[in-house]
């Protein structure tokens, strides 16, 4: 457990040694609010909690977008694997295909007894592969994408837990502040006199 230092009394909010694979820090649950806010300005604590909340919401958005992109990429790679299998099954015959030239623009082609297949590698690079080599390249890419997808899903779950913990911390500090202000009001002292 992290300890409060005199140099930065707000640093305890994060357990710096506990992070995910993507280096997202874990927020500390404030179990003893009175001890945590002692000798600190409550407004600064709120500010720090809000900053942490915004950072986690940013991570959540980034990870959600990443998951969406990786899911789409995984589907595309699976479709490519299915196409390689389909073309290989028709390697002893001629057939017609429609292919996409660019987004929304298609063309037809006649394929005569294919013995290999071409894969787009990106950056306007296309290479010819045997069916087995193409399958190997696509499977390797799909495995990498699926692993990244799994890690992103785990990180998103972690971030959602941190958002929940931060929300609870904000509520606990807010409630503590309200109780302290009520006590001051009942005692007849002002906040300035209490300090």
UniProtKB/Swiss-Prot annotation:
One of its GO terms (biological process) is tubulin complex assembly. Keywords: Chaperone. The keyword Chaperone applies. Coiled coil: none annotated. Pfam families: Prefoldin (PF02996). It comes from the Eukaryota. Binds specifically to cytosolic chaperonin (c-CPN) and transfers target proteins to it. Binds to nascent polypeptide chain and promotes folding in an environment in which there are many competing pathways for nonnative proteins. Belongs to the prefoldin subunit alpha family. This is Probable prefoldin subunit 3. The gene is pfdn3.
């Amino acid at each position: 457990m992290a300890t409060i230092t005199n140099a930065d009394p707000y640093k305890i909010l994060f357990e710096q040694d506990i992070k995910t694979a993507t280096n997202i820090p874990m927020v500390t649950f404030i179990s003893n609010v009175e001890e945590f806010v002692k000798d600190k300005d409550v407004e600064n604590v709120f500010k720090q909690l809000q900053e942490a909340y915004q950072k986690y919401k940013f991570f959540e958005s980034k990870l959600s977008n990443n998951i969406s992109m990786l899911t789409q990429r995984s589907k595309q790679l699976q479709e490519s694997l299915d196409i390689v299998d389909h073309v290989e099954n028709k390697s002893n015959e001629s057939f017609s295909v429609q292919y996409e030239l660019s987004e929304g623009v298609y063309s037809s082609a006649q394929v005569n007894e294919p013995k290999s297949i071409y894969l787009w590698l990106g950056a306007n690079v296309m290479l010819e592969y045997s069916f087995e080599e193409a399958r190997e390249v696509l499977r390797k890419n799909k495995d990498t994408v699926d692993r990244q997808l799994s890690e992103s899903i785990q990180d998103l779950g972690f971030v959602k837990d941190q958002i929940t913990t931060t929300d609870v911390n904000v509520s606990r500090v807010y409630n503590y502040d309200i109780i302290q202000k009520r006590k001051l009001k009942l005692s007849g002292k002002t906040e300035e006199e209490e300090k």
